[in-house]
Amino acid sequence: MNFHLHINRGAGAFVCGEGSALTASIEGNRGMPRVKPPRTVEQGLWGKPTVLNNVETYANVPKIILQGADWFHTIGTEGSPGTKTFSLTGSIENTGLIEVPMGTSLRHIIYDIGGGLKSGAAFKGVQIGGPSGGCLIDDQIDHPPVSYT
């Protein structure tokens, strides 16, 4: 399979992670979200239907093409197949980028993979989802598990 790929570097504004803001930025306009509908799959880049996904989604495509959708659905949970990447940072023993099956609890990620908190410090909370995410306290890191729902 051959295809042409063009990578266009954006201005780096957080808001440009939103699909319509990203297309506006690529078109040379201010990267601001637009009112929907239409969605970018109907009218996106230069007014044409546009598929936009994050790098995590695109990273799964070759594995699914090579091994099939049935294989992909064996990873994770029935309602949330596949994997999720996390960047472990802060006061944790083992920092770095990890990939876990959907359905993995944050407690498992923090303590079993991340090695727990440095110096045995008491857990106060964890921020998930980047700047637009939220914070969870100890009694919230088992449920809900990592999922799409």
Each language-model region and where it sits:
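Acidic-enriched, low-complexity/disordered segments with a strong bias for Aspartate over Glutamate
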Residues: 70, 112, 138-142
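Conserved small/polar residues in nucleotide/adenosyl-binding loops
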Residues: 149
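Hydrophobic alpha-helical positions that pack around
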Residues: 1-102, 114
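Short amphipathic, charge-patterned alpha-helical segments
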Residues: 103-118
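Terminal amphipathic helices with adjacent charged low-complexity linkers/tails
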Residues: 118-126, 130-146
